[in-house]
């Protein structure tokens, strides 16, 4: 075991904990880089990246059906993706690149819910590179139409988890003694 000093506090970590802590630091750096790169891309790229993520998460039905709406005059919907294999249920997506450090406010969520109703949609996902204000979160939780909010940190975390926009740099194999072998 080795002692690490972090913010003035001394902690004793075993080697596995050290590896886990290192992976967390790497993921935090990659997440920040992902958000910066997403923000630097064109809106169409961001919308497609969001749909790619939802497909990687298993949405899109058996054929991986997802479609991006036209870039302008899209009626408040940026993409539509099948939730099930038969295409009976669809998820409507709003994908917005907002400045890092900014917040999506309640009126934007209200507008999205209005777009959902206008499309006779039963549910939606609003994904952004920014954060959501307390008012936006409260509104999304209280409105009868299910709306999932995914902010920048959650977006980056999901991209890492599902391998969208990232690649595996190295795989580490940890071993331990197999107690069953020696019985």
Regions found by a protein language model. Give the residues of each.
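Mixed-charge (Asp/Glu-Lys/Arg
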Residues: 1-183
């Amino acid at each position: 075991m080795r002692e690490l000093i972090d913010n003035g506090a001394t902690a004793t970590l075993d080697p596995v904990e050290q590896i886990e802590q290192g992976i967390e630091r790497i993921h935090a750096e990659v997440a920040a880089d992902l958000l910066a790169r997403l923000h630097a891309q064109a809106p169409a790229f961001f919308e497609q990246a969001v749909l790619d993520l939802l497909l990687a998460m298993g949405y899109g039905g058996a054929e991986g059906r997802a479609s991006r709406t036209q870039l302008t005059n899209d009626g408040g919907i940026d993409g539509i993706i099948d939730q099930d294999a038969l295409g009976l249920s669809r998820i409507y997506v709003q994908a917005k690149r907002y400045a890092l450090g900014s917040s999506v406010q309640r009126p934007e969520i209200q507008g999205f819910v209005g777009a959902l109703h206008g499309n006779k949609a039963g549910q939606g996902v609003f994904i952004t590179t920014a954060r959501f204000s307390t008012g936006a979160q409260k509104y999304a939780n209280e409105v009868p139409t299910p709306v999932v909010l995914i902010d920048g940190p959650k977006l980056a975390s999901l991209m890492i988890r599902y391998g969208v926009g990232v690649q595996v740099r190295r795989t580490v194999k940890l071993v331990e003694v197999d107690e069953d072998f020696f019985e």
